[in-house]
Amino acid sequence: MFYGFDIGGTKIALGVFDSTRRLQWEKRVPTPHTSYSAFLDAVCELVAEADLRFGVKGAVGIGIPGMPETEDGTLYAANVPAASGKPLRADLSARLERDVRLDNDANCFALSEAWDDEFTQYPLVMGLILGTGVGGGLVLNGKPITGQSYITGEFGHMRLPVDALTLMGFDFPLRRCGCGQMGCIENYLSGRGFAWLYQHYYHQSLQAPEIIALWEQGDKQAHAHVERYLDLLAVCLGNILTIVDPCLLVIGGGLSNFTAITTQLSERLPRHLLPVARVPRIERARHGDAGGMRGAAFLHLTD
């Protein structure tokens, strides 16, 4: 059995998957913030419960936001302060007496989708998350590409390209990102960025779901906004796809529920790609909230 943990600032979610990659059991508990030992106990207790339930010693994989293992072997995860700065992988491996694998949660999302029965035919899969932020991951031949700093797929921290400024106007404000840089595309293409763009052009403060509801009702202002957003997304993706050249692009995060993104993006991309480039197949993520657990469990399928 394969145990996949999706760990975030508020919850620890465990999913148990069988050899056919089907979910057999899941459980969620709050993420402890009081101490590192309490955090370790929470993970180990879930593993012990799963071992007892299934009568096996399951393989453990963990997806967590941040850098799973820095040069000195410690975790960097600002959203999980009880474990950040600690040698999480080594400590869990010792306590659980088994190999524990860690990766960035966005890489786990991409891995989950790449191992979907419908998508395993594609050798190079790009996962793109359009949610609270913008991120993603790359999977080549069923294995995540992590890089030495675990930042492969941090697409949200690419800067706005020149074509974006041509589209939006050269007086378009370059916003300072939480990473400290100016003009990161996350500030415009995330769910919050989607809402910020609307406020910038129309001086109305609405959340993304409210704007999308107006679009569905045929509101002309919302329609113009969505057209502008999709054009900006295509411009930014043009740079990324030219570098990555994936066979499949899977889009997740809250904005992936907006069907216009997956249905209208393909037609906008060719003018931002090389003439010989092929537009990848574009699909909405299949596994929703279970994607993080799936991808973490499947870290043991990448040998």
Swiss-Prot record:
ATP binds at residues 4-11, 133-140. Its EC number is 2.7.1.59. Zn(2+) binds at H157, C177, C179, C184. GO terms for biological process: N-acetylglucosamine metabolic process; peptidoglycan turnover. InterPro entries: ATPase_NBD, N-acetyl-D-glucosamine_kinase, ROK, ROK_cs. Signal peptide: none annotated. One of its GO terms (molecular function) is zinc ion binding. It comes from the Bacteria. It catalyses: N-acetyl-D-glucosamine + ATP = N-acetyl-D-glucosamine 6-phosphate + ADP + H(+). Keywords: ATP-binding, Carbohydrate metabolism, Kinase, Metal-binding, Nucleotide-binding, Transferase, Zinc. Pathway: Cell wall biogenesis; peptidoglycan recycling. Catalyzes the phosphorylation of N-acetyl-D-glucosamine (GlcNAc) derived from cell-wall degradation, yielding GlcNAc-6-P. PANTHER family: N-ACETYL-D-GLUCOSAMINE KINASE, ROK (REPRESSOR, ORF, KINASE) FAMILY. NCBIfam families: PRK13310.1. Belongs to the ROK (NagC/XylR) family. NagK subfamily. This is N-acetyl-D-glucosamine kinase. It comes from Salmonella arizonae (strain ATCC BAA-731 / CDC346-86 / RSK2980). The lineage of its organism: Bacteria, Pseudomonadati, Pseudomonadota, Gammaproteobacteria, Enterobacterales.
